[in-house]
Amino acid sequence: MAARCAVCGKGPQTGYTVSHSHIRNKRRFLPNLQPVRTTVDGQNVRLRVCTKCLKAGKVQRVKVA
């Protein structure tokens, strides 16, 4: 499953992990995705949304009984 936000499209970025001796190793920084139940076109669906979109209120959660 792709590490991509369903709302804003934020995906992984590349960079380095740097040790104390400054040896650099390539790595991927993944977005903090959370599964959220929301309503899309009148149907309850489960989306993977980044926490930045959740905090900004771009997604309304659905209460599941």
From Swiss-Prot:
GO biological process annotation, one example: translation
Keywords of the record: Ribonucleoprotein, Ribosomal protein
Domain of life the protein comes from: Bacteria
Family named by the database record: Belongs to the bacterial ribosomal protein bL28 family.
Record-given protein name: Large ribosomal subunit protein bL28
SUPFAM superfamilies assigned to the protein according to its UniProt record, in alphabetical order: L28p-like (SSF143800)
A family per Pfam: Ribosomal_L28
GO cellular component term, pick one: ribonucleoprotein complex
